């Protein structure tokens, strides 16, 4: 990476002064459980002609996951913390790129890549329930905290 990810900040003041997000990722599901779950991408730019609308969609392989408290692979505050590149000038390739999306009912965690097009995230990996239980001793992932 030739430059620091512009969505990573050295202080809360810098984060508050940054431009607002242009899109938002929102869990989408069928309450009846007949259709597959998805991650909807919403346009949050008030000056956009598609403001408030769904501008992207990533369908998951199954229904009934109950997606819950998902987050990024790297916190926007990563540069504030010792050892994360904020103090020694080495950013170690930090980039807010992957969404980690847990399903509290399925116990699966989906990894979605938001590059090269943030409006079209793609599932790159699924951490299956049995892998989570075997390797970490956990089930029912509730909240994913970043990096």
Predicted regions and their residues:
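Asp-box/WD-like beta-propeller blade repeats and closely related beta-sheet repeat scaffolds
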Residues: 114-147
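Structural signature of eukaryotic scaffold interfaces centered on beta-propeller domains
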Residues: 1-20, 66-95, 137-147
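Short loop/turn segments immediately following the C-termini of beta-strands
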Residues: 29-31, 102-105, 114
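A short beta-strand motif characteristic of beta-propeller blades
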Residues: 4-5, 55-62, 125-135
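General structural concept
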Residues: 40-45, 50-80, 97
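Short loop/turn segments immediately following beta-strands, especially the blade-tip
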Residues: 41-50, 111-122
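Sequence/structural signature of beta-propeller modules
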Residues: 1-47
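Repetitive beta-architecture junctions, highlighting loop-to-beta-strand starts
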Residues: 22, 37, 53, 97, ...
């Amino acid at each position: 990476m030739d430059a620091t990810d512009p969505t990573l900040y050295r202080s809360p003041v810098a984060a508050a002064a940054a431009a607002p997000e242009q899109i938002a990722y929102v869990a989408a599901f069928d309450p009846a459980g007949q259709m597959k779950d998805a991650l909807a991408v919403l346009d949050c730019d008030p000056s956009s002609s598609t403001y408030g609308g769904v501008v992207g969609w990533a369908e998951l392989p199954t229904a009934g996951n109950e997606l819950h408290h998902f987050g990024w692979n790297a916190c926007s505050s990563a540069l504030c913390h010792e050892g994360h590149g904020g103090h020694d000038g080495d950013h170690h390739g930090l980039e807010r790129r992957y969404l980690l999306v847990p399903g509290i009912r399925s116990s699966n965690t989906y990894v979605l890549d938001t590059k090269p097009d943030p409006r079209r995230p793609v599932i790159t990996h699924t951490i299956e329930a049995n892998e989570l239980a075997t390797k970490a001793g956990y089930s029912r992932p509730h909240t994913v905290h970043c990096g």
